[in-house]
Amino acid sequence: MAVDRSIIGRKSPSFTVTVEAGKIKEFAAAVGEASELCWDEDRPGGIVAPPTFSHIFRSGKMELMLSDCGLDATKFLHGEHEMVYHRPLRPGDRISYHIEVADVQEKAGRRSGTMDIVTFETVLRDAVGEKVQTIRQTFVARR
């Protein structure tokens, strides 16, 4: 059954998180990040989060968004992931975001048959509304 294109533009509720230095260091340790940018609080500008740190904000929320759109998360595979960094995340940043369905496409593969491709976009903004990161994530499901 085809994914209903009317879900394009559907948004999750808004979420707000505050970036913490301890969480940056925990994440950096977990992913093996050795850069002093993530560890040296005394360096000019202080520490910054590793590039993929924002994934912890969205943990579990993407599955909820798929479900809210009537999509079975167990049928979808991760297809593509793009992150645009407008500036680094720093301790104390208050970040607001929501997840939005950006696009729904249908593609026919020679061997795989018809597939639905759903793209979500998340824009992380700081307390004054400036973009910090833009994340586009694409999921693929065979019919």
Regions found by a protein language model. Give the residues of each.
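Hot-dog-fold acyl-thioester-processing enzymes
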Residues: M1-E80
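HotDog/MaoC-like acyl-thioester-processing domains
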Residues: M1-V3, Y85-R143
